[in-house]
Amino acid sequence: KVENRATGIVMNVKTGEIVAMAVKGDYDPNNPFVIADEEERARIAELPEEEQQEATSAALQAQWRNKAVSDTYYPGSVFKMVTLSMALEENVATEETTFTCTGSYVPVQGERAINCHNTSGHGTQTLVQGTMNSCNPFFIYLGQLLGTETFFDYFEAFGFTQKTGIDLPGESQSIYHDRDMSLMDLAVESFGQ
């Protein structure tokens, strides 16, 4: 159940060392073979007997999984700072760059519109204002100025296409791995989705 879990990592930003890690949606390590989720236990109990063992095994594997290491999540709006740094480094944007946010933006003709969190729009904003407003359409625009090739080159340079190498088992693969990203991929990845 996604709504009943949380994951947190505290990292030494100078060394990358994991200082603390916690996952809520856990189990009792003194009784690791007891399914902690009461609803899941009840659901399994209702299954035909021949299906219960497989369902129990799957539920136990899911609760033992270290979601901080083994699951992959989109970075969300914090990724906008990466897009911003790319745009500034490549000189495709400056502090004077402007973009008019109308509340949504169609990055690729014929595709769906992508909404801003401010559905009435921010109006015309500078680079600083677009960043302060965390405006998704503004960052889509920056991504388009960069283009897919340059954008992916930075993905690789920042190490986003590789595993971190954390000294824990089960690290998942990156969600960013396709150099042949579409223009719609570029649009959503430019603001962290």
Residue spans of the language-model regions?
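Short loop/turn motifs at secondary-structure junctions and domain boundaries
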Residues: 2-4
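Beta-lactam-recognizing serine transpeptidase/beta-lactamase-like catalytic domain environment
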Residues: 6-78, 82-193
